[in-house]
Amino acid sequence: MACVDEPPEKHCWVCFATEKEDRAAEWVSPCRCKGCTKWIHQSCLQRWLDEKQKGNSGGAVSCPQCGTEYRIVFPKMGPVVYFLQQVDRALSRASPFAAAGVVVGTVYWSAVTYGAVTVMQVVGHKKGLDVMERADPLFLLMGLPTIPVMLVLGKMIRWEDYVVRLWQRHSAKLQIFSGLVPGMGRALPRVPVEGSYGGDHLSVSRTLCGALIFPSIANLVGRLLFRRVTSNLQRTILGGIAFVVMKGVLKVYFKQQQYLIQANRHILNYPEPEGQADGATEDEDSSNE
């Protein structure tokens, strides 16, 4: 508002009502403003404060014109209300830490359960239970959660990429294998930019799922390929090694073929319309004559 001189009667700058229109209303001058923005209805200011505080009754609110912070007072509360208020504040402060503790505890006991199931799956159900019953409880509480952690860390070791880089570096020396692997030992027209042919970026969900499902896959491969092995532990270990080797060989071959595809990429000329192409050919012939 551009009003500078104080009007003869009070004027609310929220609802624009005057003192004559509502003589029973309570008026307040909460800031240093002068003129027509000096006065405001107590009820209008209360509603305006509710909108600005947005549920935070203890938040500070200032005048939008002069920037003076409003002095807000509350009636004195009794000891019971004060105690309940302190309890409510303490619970509000402690709830994030409690929630974090619940999440950490859930993850920890999930890891313990997964570790116990993995032990029974790898060693055998009866033998696994017997081993865990005879083991120290503290050792189980510390050792079982490390099983999924070690599986995830092992999954993050990308040894196939190292083999692919060695293959690409020494491919010229491996021409004797050109009959087994297409493109082995051939000269490449260009070297692709690293990362443009991988197509296998490190995915958190893929790494986590692959690591946690690995014991089940190792057990299944061991049962299929090494049925004559009587020990469940040895059969699972052999199945895991066989799966890692077969998967690694296929992955290395796939990445190398992607590398060759990118290296032999070729860009074609823009196809001209037939009429323009014939005209261009005639122009070239006439210029040659």
From Swiss-Prot:
One of the entry's Gene Ontology molecular-function terms is:
zinc ion binding
Q: Where are the zinc fingers (RING-CH-type)?
A: 4-73
- Membrane topology qualifier: Multi-pass membrane protein
Write down the CDD domains for this protein, in alphabetical order.
RING_CH-C4HC3_MARCH5
Check the record and name the Gene3D superfamilies matching this protein.
Answer: Zinc/RING finger domain, C3HC4 (zinc finger)
Report the locations given in the UniProt record: Mitochondrion outer membrane; Endoplasmic reticulum membrane
Please tell me where Zn(2+) 1 binds in this chain.
C12, C15, H41, C44
Its domain description in UniProt is:
The RING-CH-type zinc finger domain is required for E3 ligase activity.
Q: What protein am I looking at? A: E3 ubiquitin-protein ligase MARCHF5
Species this protein is from: Danio rerio
Question: Highest lineage ranks of the organism?
Answer: Eukaryota, Metazoa, Chordata, Craniata, Vertebrata
